[in-house]
Amino acid sequence: MGNKVREFMTHREPDEHIWVERDEDGLIGTVRAGQRPMPRIRVFDLLESHPGGSQALVWDGETLRIAAEQVKGREPGLTRAADYDLIFFQFSGASAIESEYGSIELEPGDVALIPAGIAHRTTGKGECLRLRAMSKGAVNLGVDAEKPLTETRFNVSHSEPLSAHNGAGADENGRLLEHITFWDPTSDLWIERRAAELVGCVKEGGRGLKKLRAFDYFTGMTGKGGARAPVLYTGEEFRIDVYNLEGQQRGFHRGLDEDEVWFQFRGHAVNDTEWGIVELDPGEMSYVPRGIAHRINGGKGFLRMVFYTRHLIHPKAFNSSAGKKTSFTVE
C-alpha cells in the first residue's frame, strides 16, 4: 500500500466536492491509454515562426479559443468582435486600448473584458505580449473592479525579446479599416471608418470597459483548504480564476465536466497528474482534460491563471512549431 492522499472530484453543475482517499502512487503517471495528453507549450516562442508573426492560436474549442499575441506599436485598424467576448491578459509590456467605451492601459498582470460588439484597437508599448481569450458565450465580472484587496506591480523580462518594430498605423484623424469578426470567420467584414469618431462614442448601456488587476483579489493562500481562488470572470460555459499556491496542494483535484487551461504567470510549478509530471515556468501553458486527477506543487511566488470551459478544448500549437527556446523572469 502506498501513501494515502485525498482527492476531490468536482462538477460545475451541481457545484459539489466529493472527497475520496486514494493511494498516491496510483495518481501519478498511471494513464495507460487516452487521446488527450498534457503538453507543455512555450506560447510566446510560437510567434516568431508563426505566419504574420503577431498571433498564434494555441487552444481551440467549441466555445473558447485562446491565442498568444504580440502587438507592435499601434494596430493599423479597428476590430469589432460581433458575436463573442474578448478578454486580454497582459503578460509583458503594456497595451493602450482605445474603444467605443473609452480608453484603458494594461500592464503586466492586468486583464480586461471587451464585450461583444465593441470596436477597439491597441497600441503596444515595449515588448507587448498578451493572451487573447475568445468566449462564444457572454462573460461577466466575478469581482469588483473598483475594490482590489492589494496593489501589486510586476516587472517581466524576456531572455530574447521579440522585435517590436512596426510601421505606424493610420493618423488619428484619418480613415482606416474596421474588421468585424465573427465566431465563424466566413462572415467577416471590413468597413472603412474614421477612428476619432468611434473612440468613446458609447453614451449608455452595456457592460462597459474595466480592467482588473488579476492577482490582487486573494484573501489568503489558495489550494490549502482555506482561501478560495478568486473568480475574475464567469459565464454559463466559461470562467477564469487565479491561484497563488506555494507548496503542495491539499489534495488531488479531478474535474469531471470541465477542461482546465493553465497559464503560468510567475514562479515554477511541478504538476503531478495521471498523465505524469508536467512542469511549468512563466509564459508557459498546459491543460488538464476533464477526468484527469492533478495536484500542484507551487514554487516561490507562484501565480497562475486558469481558464475553465465546459466544452472540449484542444491544443493547436506545440513547441515543435517554435523556432527557439526562450524564458521569462517575473518579479
Question: How does the language model describe each region?
Answer:
Residues L129-N173, F318-V330:
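A hydrophobic/aromatic-rich effector-binding and dimerization subdomain
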Residues G225-F252, L256-F263:
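Acidic/His-leaning functional-site neighborhoods
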Residues E62, E98-G102, K125, D272-G276, ...:
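Short strand-coil-strand connectors
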Residues M1-A68, E75-L78, T150-D241, E331:
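A short, N-terminal "cap"/entry segment at the start of jelly-roll beta-barrel domains
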Residues R80-I97, A133, N244-E246, R254-N271, ...:
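Short, conserved beta-strand element in jelly-roll/cupin
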Residues E100-G117, E274-I292:
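Short acidic-glycine-tyrosine-enriched beta hairpin
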Residues A116-K147, R290-K316:
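Ligand-binding loop in jelly-roll beta-barrel domains
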